[in-house]
Amino acid sequence: MAEALASQLNNTTLGEASSDTRWKDQLKAPAKDARPQTEDVTATKGLEFEDFYIKRELMMGIFEAGFEKPSPIQEETIPVALTGRDILARAKNGTGKTAAFVIPTLERINPKSTKTQALILVPTRELALQTSHVCKTLGKHLGINVMVTTGGTGLMDDIIRLNDAVHILVGTPGRVLDLASKGVADLSECPTFVMDEADKLLSPEFTPVIEQLLSFHPKDRQVMLFSATFPLIVKSFKDKHMRNPYEINLMDELTLRGITQYYAFVEEKQKVHCLNTLFSKLQINQSIIFCNSTNRVELLAKKITELGYSCFYSHARMLQQHRNRVFHDFRNGVCRNLVCSDLLTRGIDIQAVNVVINFDFPKNAETYLHRIGRSGRFGHLGLAINLINWDDRFNLYKIEQELGTEIQPIPQNIDKKLYVYESPETIPRPIANASQAQLATSGNQTQNMGERRHNNHSNGGHYQFGRGRGSYRGGRSQGQRRNMQNEMNKFGTSQNQQQSGKSQPAQVSPN
């Protein structure tokens, strides 16, 4: 009898083991990313996701999303987070921080409960949308409901959605506090409280809101803070609201190793000419171009379109639905260049971006770090080019000193191996149709002077090239159109140059 029972148990175990070896083969995983990676994500302990003993349904979502092995921040965070301990984690942008807190959060969710069990706070609407997308993608086999709520959208819509079970709530602090204060979002049994980009969330403008939100959570909550930089205000919050947090610091150096940084000394009125030269010489897959004001964002987007290049723009003064559409289309490869303010400096992950250009140089090291971190995502290669005028020289030196990095003068020819991959097929692109894919991979990936793309963006954030001029197609949220003539004069492009779409290339090497 005992032998028969043992034989039956052995047969069952063998069957389960056989099943264990087959479930991965049935997954619809994306094509493997063949691009080389830097030590930012490869210097691991050799762990596998299976070593964390998480649910198979969660592992299915992880592998189907294209994850292969945990990155260093994920190796350090996930096992500790699964125990419920508070975590204070500091790691570089683009090294897998989002998945580091999303995976343990998903693992601890009970789908049978109708209560909200996790709150994830982020500082911007775009980052909220991206984070909720990660939650839904990794947790798609778990049967859980993820909701994103931000300012700028209808409050009544959020109230209606909260009538259903919401297991994970992702949002910006102000909107979540509004819902919690009205008793619509019930956080009384929400044990997980996560803050991404914690340094921004704990700035003076957000801190009172964060502390009010904590009061709606149970006292035995788990608090997890993630960021690339931790100022003194984070230490103050830790001492006040966290219990013996496990501290992770993977910031032996601040900048990503895969990003090559250059500067070019350029007079203000020559910046557009210099940008034109860069476009004609660089092999750009997608680029993000930063300006220091919303006014200059729109002006530059218009100038780029007049020069004949595809271009979207985004800034904080646009309607939220317009910003969402621009972000979605750019991420899907509809357009090659995006001009924006610092709205998109934090956490935004678009892996097809291989070039970042600071058309306006930032004033501090923190902003610079977040800007250039939009390229070189997850250990890959990227290029950061800074257009510097005479007034920026002290900020350049200060940022180099604070970050412990070297920003080199731009050479006449930039080695493509620093930011270009041998085959465009190695670049992951979430493109929905063939026409978009053709835009992404046509030719040799280089923008040419004669390239004129008519991106008829219906919701603003776009300039259409026509009749030799960029025509305005919406994108502003309020107020009358501002008189931009003074700023246009600063850019130094003549009327004839605007109509022809051509300008003389600037000398981008330093004097």
Curated annotation (Swiss-Prot):
GO molecular function, one term: RNA helicase activity
Residues given in the record as ATP binding sites: A91, K92, N93, G94, T95, G96, K97, T98
GO terms, biological process: mRNA processing; mRNA transport; regulation of translation
The EC number(s) this enzyme carries: 3.6.4.13
Chain intervals with Basic and acidic residues compositional bias: 19-38
SMART domains linked to this entry: DEXDc, HELICc
Motif segment (DEAD box): 196-199
Residues of the Helicase C-terminal domain: 258-418
Top-rank taxon, per record: Eukaryota
Record CDD domains: DEADc_DDX6 (cd17940), SF2_C_DEAD (cd18787)
Keyword set, alphabetical order: ATP-binding, Cytoplasm, Helicase, Hydrolase, mRNA processing, mRNA transport, Nucleotide-binding, RNA-binding, Translation regulation, Transport
InterPro entries, per database record: DEAD/DEAH_box_helicase_dom (IPR011545), Helicase_ATP-bd (IPR014001), Helicase_C-like (IPR001650), P-loop_NTPase (IPR027417), RNA-helicase_DEAD-box_CS (IPR000629), RNA_helicase_DEAD_Q_motif (IPR014014)
Catalytic reaction equation(s): ATP + H2O = ADP + phosphate + H(+)
Main subcellular localisation: cytoplasm
Biased composition (Gly residues): 467-477
Pfam families found in the cross-reference section: DEAD, Helicase_C
Domain Helicase ATP-binding: 78-248
Name of the top EC class for this enzyme: hydrolase
GO CC term, one of those recorded: P-body
Keyword Ion transport tagged: no
Domain-related comment: The Q motif is unique to and characteristic of the DEAD box family of RNA helicases and controls ATP binding and hydrolysis.
Family, similarity comment: Belongs to the DEAD box helicase family. DDX6/DHH1 subfamily.
Record-linked PANTHER family: DEAD-BOX ATP-DEPENDENT RNA HELICASE 50
Role of this protein: ATP-dependent RNA helicase involved in mRNA turnover, and more specifically in mRNA decapping by activating the decapping enzyme DCP1. Is involved in G1/S DNA-damage checkpoint recovery, probably through the regulation of the translational status of a subset of mRNAs. May also have a role in translation and mRNA nuclear export.
Name recorded for this polypeptide: ATP-dependent RNA helicase dhh1
Species name: Aspergillus oryzae (strain ATCC 42149 / RIB 40) (Yellow koji mold)
Gene name tied to this protein: dhh1
